[in-house]
């Protein structure tokens, strides 16, 4: 599946590989914009809407092999042989899955606050309840939707993040498929070891990349290095963009 993208040309001359930015669950291509705005200085940038998100096509399947194939199809459509991939959460898993499908298309890999594991946890049921409450109402504006969502969610930052995908009274993500396929999204099928340097950027306050996942991570990414961002939660890049960009640039320049 060819994904909806936003492509930007680097502002300065360079020999760097293009960077593909891959968002997480309930997101869109805007979500890693804080990284794009810096990295476009010396890299061509592709931001993607993942399947069933934003303006990309809808499909009943939402697993990581399918998402990885979408990334290959999108590279092909842009006539890009090889790229650096930076993915957050679900997007990070999609990028990791790409190592098993088409490792020759990857220059470098960055996974932000995610590990290659099956989490076996439902962390988003309250979010689904809030989203469905808006869908069942006659809310047309983000202000109306926010009032409904506050009955289900306490974190204003999460509400505002979700509302970026509420346009003209409609959600831009495919709620029924995301609900149906949720076990695949939190899940993971182990992949063969990818024996190249990869950067993992966990948030110090996030449960997504804890010590219990270390062995699984190193079995699949034996040359992984982690740069923990102290004081950050799951949305590391939004909370501590400068620290995340420093870690990414150090890795890209090695």
Curated annotation (Swiss-Prot):
Keyword terms of this UniProt record: Hydrolase, Serine esterase
Active site: 89, 234
GO molecular function, one term: carboxylesterase activity
Pfam families: Abhydrolase_6
Enzyme nomenclature, EC number: 3.1.-.-
GO cellular component: cytosol
Main EC class the enzyme belongs to: hydrolase
Protein family (similarity comment): Belongs to the DmpD/TodF/XylF esterase family.
Function in brief: Displays esterase activity toward palmitoyl-CoA, malonyl-CoA and pNP-butyrate.
Protein name: Esterase YbfF
Organism: Escherichia coli (strain K12)
Gene behind this protein: ybfF
């Amino acid at each position: 599946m060819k994904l909806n993208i936003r492509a930007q040309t680097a502002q300065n001359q360079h020999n760097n590989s293009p960077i593909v930015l891959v968002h997480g669950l309930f997101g869109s291509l805007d979500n890693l914009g804080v990284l794009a705005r810096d990295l476009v200085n010396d890299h061509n940038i592709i931001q993607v809407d993942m399947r069933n998100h934003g303006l990309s096509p809808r499909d009943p399947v939402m697993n990581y092999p399918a998402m990885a194939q979408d990334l290959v199809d999108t590279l092909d459509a842009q006539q890009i042989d090889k790229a650096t991939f930076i993915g957050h959460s679900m997007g990070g898993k999609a990028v990791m899955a790409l190592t098993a499908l088409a490792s020759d298309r990857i220059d470098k890999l960055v996974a932000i606050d995610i590990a290659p594991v099956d989490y076996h946890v439902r962390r988003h049921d309250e979010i689904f309840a809030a989203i469905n409450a808006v869908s069942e109402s006659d809310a047309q504006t983000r202000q109306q939707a926010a009032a409904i969502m506050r009955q289900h969610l306490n974190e204003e930052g999460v509400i505002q993040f979700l509302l970026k995908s509420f346009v003209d009274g409609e959600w831009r993500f495919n709620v029924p498929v995301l609900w149906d396929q949720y076990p695949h999204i939190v899940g993971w099928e182990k992949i063969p070891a990818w024996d190249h340097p990869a950067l993992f950027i966990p948030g110090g306050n996030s449960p997504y990349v804890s010590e219990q996942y270390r062995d699984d991570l190193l079995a699949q990414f034996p040359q992984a290095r982690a740069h923990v961002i102290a004081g950050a939660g799951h949305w590391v890049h939004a909370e501590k963009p400068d620290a995340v960009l420093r870690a990414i640039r150090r890795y890209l320049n090695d």
